[in-house]
């Protein structure tokens, strides 16, 4: 299973859209994908869930433990994203391979 890591804070709608595009693409190729952005974005926006970083990071890191590899989508600012960096650190600690993907072609025109 692939854990999809994407920076989120400050560009929530873009991150959600890019996560959906990449998850759909990967799933069409037969991959099983876990996207905490897709799950968390919908839950937080529709069901009055907490929006604080620590709440979601705790859940995200638990989900990461179940995955075989992690894909990081290199949206602008990914290197400074506290969440992405913590996920990279945890994946490294767990021995989970990390693949970095360029965001070119994933960002909708006008953003």
Label each region the model flagged.
Residues 1-111:
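Conserved catalytic or regulatory cores that recognize and/or transform ribose-phosphate-containing ligands
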């Amino acid at each position: 299973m692939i854990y999809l890591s994407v920076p989120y804070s400050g560009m929530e709608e873009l991150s959600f859209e890019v996560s959906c595009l990449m998850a759909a693409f990967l799933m069409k190729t037969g991959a099983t994908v876990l996207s905490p952005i897709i799950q968390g974005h919908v839950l937080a926006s529709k069901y009055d869930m907490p929006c604080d970083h620590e709440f979601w990071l705790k859940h995200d890191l638990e989900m990461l433990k179940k995955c075989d590899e992690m894909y990081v989508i290199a949206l602008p600012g990914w290197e400074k994203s506290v969440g992405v960096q913590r996920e990279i650190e945890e994946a490294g600690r767990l021995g989970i391979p990390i693949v970095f993907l360029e965001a070119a072609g994933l960002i909708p025109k006008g953003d």
